Design a protein with these regions (language model features):
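Conserved N-terminal phosphate-binding loop of PLP-dependent enzymes in the Aspartate aminotransferase
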Residues: 1-402
């Protein structure tokens, strides 16, 4: 079928919930995607920070093939070896701090949903039934289930789905005074992203980090959403390591499965012990197939020098982006950490226009805000691929800056 015929069929059979445009890809290898017409694109979206080893990575393909031919699913009324092994790796990673217990899910939204439930149960049992409120940040994004939508500090996403889950309160990113003022006897936790991916690639300030530490010292739980920042994207396995934070609960997804549906939340013993059989569950989370993929990805990130590669390629990419900014005058700021990079443009330049210009250069990028474009290559991107991306992106920016 032609691309047009397939898209027409998709429009007739699928919910109209995504602005997919006219791109339809049929295969991928490494950093490249091939569309239905045989055209190849350099992929700096990576499934939105998900395909951290690129497309059709041999380690992932081998893990899927071997495990699928052995055991795919049993449910969580039984133990399975791959999930035990992956949980052990996550909690024994040197930067995990006091994180000690893992619950596997299928997505980031599910991971955050479980984290919110756990925080509320902890608050009720430790401080009383009134202690169930959770503070989150404006411009945050935590998912699209009712609880995670309620935790997401973006009113435009709320308007058609009221009433939201009560007990979620928002403060502005990096407003330490507002954060402290929002805390009361009903507050059990604060939920933050170290870097707001969907919100514009905005990072926690040093002052705000200190305020979070003080609240944590005074008994509030700190939940960190690492769905987009985790699994090495920022240069450490968890981004919170670079902010000097030690969360009570952390959520993971995206890179954890490298394109396979896999999420998790991890908690310290003192918090995790408040969940008992029947408090939370999932049919498919932590299935042997997904966990086998997670094991392969974890091993590759930790053993193949990928974290060092993130640092080197991030420096190379930022250096080239700064040259583009200087040459075009269209860029106001480069933001982010590691290979989670946001390019903020002047207000007259829309992210959609940059994305369209990149399409013309056979390169894929994704928006974060109306004037912020994200660059999210896999962690194993090479120096040559960074050079190619800079050439394509530079040509696109020159076009929109005219």
């Amino acid at each position: 079928m032609t691309t047009e015929d397939l898209i027409e069929l998709g429009n007739s059979a699928l919910f109209n919930t995504y602005n997919r445009g006219d791109k339809l890809f049929v295969s991928g290898k490494g950093l490249y995607l091939t569309n239905n017409d045989g055209e190849e694109y350099l992929d700096f979206v990576s499934g939105i920070a998900t395909n951290i080893l690129g497309h059709a990575n041999e380690k992932i393909v081998d893990a899927v093939t071997k495990q699928a031919s052995t055991l795919m699913h049993t449910s969580n009324i039984y133990w399975n070896k791959p999930s035990i092994e992956l949980a052990d790796k996550l909690v024994n990673y040197k930067g995990a701090g006091k994180l000690a217990k893992v619950f596997f899910s299928n997505s980031g939204a599910e991971a955050n949903e479980g984290a919110l439930k756990l925080a509320r149960k902890y608050g009720r049992e430790v401080n009383g039934e009134h202690c169930t409120e959770i503070i989150t940040l404006t411009d945050s994004f935590h998912g699209r289930t009712m609880a995670t939508l309620s935790a997401t500090g973006q009113p435009d996403m709320h308007k058609d789905f009221q009433p939201l889950l009560p007990g979620l309160n928002y403060v502005a990113l990096n407003d330490s005074d507002a954060l402290k003022a929002a805390v009361n006897e009903n507050t059990c936790a604060v939920l933050v992203e170290t870097i707001q991916g969907e919100g514009g690639i905005n990072s926690l300030s040093d002052e705000f980090v200190q305020a979070l530490k003080e609240l944590q010292d005074n008994g509030l739980l700190l939940i960190i959403d690492e769905v987009q920042t985790g699994m090495g994207r920022t240069g450490t396995l968890f981004s919170f390591e670079q902010f000097g934070l030690e969360p009570d609960i952390v959520s993971l997804a995206k890179g954890l499965g490298g394109g396979f549906p896999l999420g998790a939340f991890i908690a310290t013993d003192k918090v995790a012990d408040h969940f008992n059989p029947g408090d939370h569950g999932t049919t498919l989370g932590g299935n042997p197939l997904g966990a086998a993929v997670g094991n392969a990805i974890f091993d590759e990130v930790m053993d193949a020098g990928l974290l060092d590669n993130v640092a080197a390629r991030a420096e190379q990419l930022n250096r080239g982006l700064q040259q583009i900014a200087d040459q075009t005058g269209a860029v106001t700021e480069l933001k982010g950490l590691g290979l989670l990079i946001g390019v903020q443009f002047k207000d007259k330049v829309q992210a959609a226009d940059v994305i369209a210009a990149c399409y013309d250069e056979k390169m894929l990028v994704v928006a974060a805000k109306h004037n912020v474009v994200r660059l999210l290559p896999p962690l194993n991107v090479t120096a040559a691929e960074i050079d190619e991306a800079l050439e394509k992106f530079g040509a696109a920016v020159e076009k929109v800056a005219e």
